[in-house]
């Protein structure tokens, strides 16, 4: 009898630990998806604002509430399927192209929630819905006015970035975003405007290295 009780107690202990671990994993996944998560800068497209190998904390509350970002916000979003839109594709639509998401519930969860095999870009919001964006003579014009971009390095000019999206109206429900390192950034100049539902997070603070820890100014 005593041996049976010990076995039952051991099984109960194991089950309690398993349940605790499962609950902790669920909480961690939900927190990462809806609230925030860390990430590492892996490309130079946002230099000098963000440098490679810096650690950032991403605020996902903006996606959770489906709030439109503001001009100057640094965001992350799902990388479009088509890297460069042709002139004929732009005439059809200036919105970035994405493949149809997995129809299988498990595949959709793995891709969208766990973000396994998902590629994301980090860029700065430049144009907002309804605004007329023109890239001309190395400058960016919004509704006919040159925008001030103090975050760019001195001497940086904005060309077409090997793309054709240089004179257009930003469609409703989308944003136009570019990297601060304009010469080394594949961005909305190439693949078009990003739908709000594809925006994953807003960059909030640098968390590493410690000498640059803090909120990122626009």
Q: Model features per residue range: what roles?
A:
Residues 2-15, 34, 48-218:
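Soluble "head" domains of membrane/secretory-pathway proteins
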Residues 16-34:
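Hydrophobic membrane-insertion alpha-helices, especially the h-region
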Residues 30-44:
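Aromatic-capped interface at the extracytoplasmic side
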């Amino acid at each position: 009898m005593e041996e049976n009780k010990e076995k039952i107690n051991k099984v109960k202990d194991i089950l309690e630990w398993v349940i605790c671990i499962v609950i902790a994993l669920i909480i961690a996944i939900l927190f990462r998806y809806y609230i925030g998560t860390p990430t590492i800068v892996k490309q130079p497209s946002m230099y000098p604002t963000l440098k490679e190998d810096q650690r950032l904390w991403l605020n996902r509350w903006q996606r959770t509430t489906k709030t439109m970002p503001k001009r100057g916000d640094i965001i992350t979003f799902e990388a479009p399927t088509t890297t460069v839109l042709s002139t004929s594709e732009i005439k059809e639509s200036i919105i970035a192209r994405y493949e149809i998401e997995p129809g299988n519930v498990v595949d959709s969860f793995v891709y969208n929630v766990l973000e396994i095999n998902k590629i994301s870009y980090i860029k700065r919001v430049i144009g907002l819905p309804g605004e007329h964006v023109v890239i001309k003579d190395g400058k960016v014009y919004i509704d006919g006015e040159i925008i001030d971009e103090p975050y760019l390095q001195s001497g940086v000019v904005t060309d077409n970035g090997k793309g054709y999206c240089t004179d257009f109206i930003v469609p409703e429900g989308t944003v136009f975003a570019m990297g601060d390192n304009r010469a080394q950034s594949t961005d909305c100049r190439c693949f078009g405007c990003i739908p709000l539902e594809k925006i994953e997070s807003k960059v909030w603070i640098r968390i590493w290295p410690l000498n640059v820890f803090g909120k990122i100014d626009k």
